[in-house]
Curated annotation (Swiss-Prot):
Biased composition (Low complexity): 37-51
Residue spans crossing the bilayer: 9-29, 328-348, 351-371, 417-437, 452-472, 498-518
Localization: Cell inner membrane
The name this protein goes by in its record: Membrane protein insertase YidC
Similarity-based family: Belongs to the OXA1/ALB3/YidC family. Type 1 subfamily.
Keyword Membrane: yes
Topology of this chain in the membrane: Multi-pass membrane protein
Gene3D superfamilies assigned to the protein according to its UniProt record, in alphabetical order: 2.70.98.90
Organism: Helicobacter pylori (strain J99 / ATCC 700824) (Campylobacter pylori J99)
Length: 549
């Protein structure tokens, strides 16, 4: 068998398997985030601990609570048109509820459950939510304050705050006060329609001394029940360096100086604190007892002015609050490239007003950009197809002499200007594009509950009738049928014929938006191949005509 063709096969198979690996890894090896009903039974304030600015090995002692904490009660409620925020008696954000319709769709069923329901005569009895809670009931709450002094800390956790108002709306000021005898804590909060807020922490004491303390942005949201993306703590410092601590990876206390924002995230939502001070703040990452999930704290020694946000990781909303907050949207190793892809996709959405059509336009743009390379690759494959008979003759002639066969093959390629790997280059370049689009479409909360046409009512979940995956497989097979076949080994041909089936199987549970991209990509590739085949055929005829003349 021709060594170059063999290498060609291996390269293409490696690329194909790279795509399939995404599906396999996500489906079989990553665990979804636990739901709010699956959270631990331990009380957060009794079990979570943080480090102090000065302590190093006394984590289990610093900022801990040794006394029993009474069940916190509701202190204040801030109501918005599409959300509601509750403040508890310990001066923390108890819960954030989203009321926007796009976030209230029922949980997506698993593949087998969905198929079973699809062929069942029973109607879907799963009701939509009335409101979506973002925070776990028994996890670390945003705006919780802890002191280094254990006596003061325990007193703080057993002394309720008083509030200036019990009900208020956006842009109204809420003052929370806690009287600890010789020390009073005053939290001044202003919440806005976009769910970001301003926070001022002040103290009153006879000697004007401020004890060392920390404040937290809280445990990550748990609203996304089927997360196969990054979840944990993400922060950025003044050098624009981003640090990530994933769930189950918080094994020791970590300190990060000059931090600009501290965020805890799941697939679609975040709770964060940030500063406008160019010097930043010191962030401390602790580990939740039992799970080793990261818990974020800000270490403070003085009064503080901070800002926060709890809500969807919507690109435009975060950018409007502060451009640096768009870095909260995490795309993995190719974030720098994926973010550019999303910006282009978002621009196209603003132009057409539909995410499905925006994805199709994005695919067209990608194909146009890659066309010159695709053309060269297809020309090279066509030349290899024409050389197939001569290649077979050489294989028969130099059977058992691989070195001579290789040398004569290279001479043949050079003589006719053919490149055995030329057809793979466009496919190789599509790898980062595919991964970027995969990460964008899987992470973009903007696509949640976004309709396209007919049966596609949500581009963020799998096609309910599997029509797009089947079309994708058919279009991939169609593309194979119009692409020049340069393989001389029957086994190679059989393996390639299986690729459409494998892609269909492993992409069947992927978000409809991603499958729409791949289907459109295949159809455009077919059209492009037909055009190039026609161009090459015309050139071949013209060349033959010139020889006759």
């Amino acid at each position: 068998m021709d060594k170059n063709n063999n290498n060609n096969l291996r390269l293409i198979l490696a690329i194909a398997l790279s795509f399939l690996f995404i599906a396999l890894y996500s489906y079989f090896f990553q665990e979804p985030n636990k739901t709010t009903t699956e959270t631990t039974k331990q009380e957060t304030t009794n079990n979570h601990t943080a480090t102090s600015p000065t302590a190093s090995n006394t984590i289990t002692q610093d900022f801990s609570v040794t006394q029993t904490i009474p069940q916190e009660s509701l202190l204040s409620t801030i109501s918005f048109e599409h959300a509601k925020i509750e403040i508890d008696s310990l001066g923390r954000i108890k819960q954030v509820y989203l009321k926007d319709k796009k976030y209230l769709t029922p949980k997506e069923k698993g593949f087998l459950e969905h198929v079973s329901h699809l062929f069942s005569s029973k109607e879907n009895s799963q009701p939509s939510l009335k409101e979506l809670p973002l925070l776990a009931a028994d996890k670390l709450k945003p705006l919780e304050v802890r002191f280094l002094d254990p006596t003061l800390n325990n007193k703080a956790f057993n002394t309720p705050y008083s509030a200036s108002k019990t009900t208020l709306g956006p842009n109204e000021q809420l003052v929370l006060t806690q009287d600890l005898g010789t020390l009073s804590i005053i939290k001044t909060l202003t919440f806005y329609d976009d769910l970001h807020y301003d926070l001022k922490i002040a103290f009153k004491s006879p000697n004007n001394l401020i004890p060392s303390y920390v404040i937290t942005n809280g445990y990550r949201p748990v609203a996304d029940l089927d997360s196969y993306t990054f979840s944990g703590v993400l922060l950025e410092n003044t050098d624009k360096k981003i640090e990530k601590i994933e769930d189950k990876d918080a094994k020791e206390i970590k300190r990060f100086s000059n931090t600009l924002f501290l965020s805890s995230v799941d697939r679609y939502f975040t709770t964060l604190l940030f500063t406008k001070d160019p010097q930043g703040f010191e962030a401390l990452i602790d580990s939740e007892i039992g799970t080793k999930n990261p818990l974020g704290f800000i270490s403070l020694k003085n009064e503080a002015n901070l800002h926060g946000y709890i809500g969807p990781k919507d690109y435009r909303s975060l950018k409007a609050i502060s451009p640096m907050l768009t870095d909260v949207i995490e795309y993995g190793l190719i974030t720098f490239f994926a973010k550019g892809v999303f910006v282009l996709l978002d621009y196209l959405y603003q132009f057409v007003g539909n995410w499905g059509w925006a994805i199709i336009l994005l695919t067209i743009i990608v194909r146009i950009i890659l066309y010159p390379l695709s053309y060269k690759g297809m020309v090279s494959m066509q030349k290899l197809k024409e050389l197939a008979p001569k290649m077979k003759e050489l294989q028969e002639k130099y059977k058992g002499e691989p070195q001579k066969l290789q040398a004569h093959m290279m001479q043949l390629y050079k003589k006719h200007g053919a490149n055995p790997l030329g057809g793979c280059l466009p496919l190789i370049l599509q790898i980062p594009v595919f991964f970027a689009i995969y990460r964008v479409l899987y992470n973009a909360v903007e696509l949640k509950s976004s309709e396209w046409v007919l049966w596609i009512h949500d581009l963020s979940i799998m096609d309910p009738y599997f029509i797009l995956p089947l079309l994708m497989g058919a279009s991939m097979y169609w593309h194979q049928s119009v692409t020049p076949n340069t393989m001389t080994d029957p086994m190679q041909a059989k393996i390639f014929k299986l690729l459409p089936l494998l892609f269909t199987i492993f992409l069947i549970t992927f978000p409809a938006g991603l499958v729409l991209y791949w289907t459109t990509h295949n159809i455009l590739s077919v059209l492009q191949q037909l055009i190039i085949n026609k161009v090459l055929e015309n050139k071949k005829r013209a060349h033959a005509q010139n020889i006759k003349e």
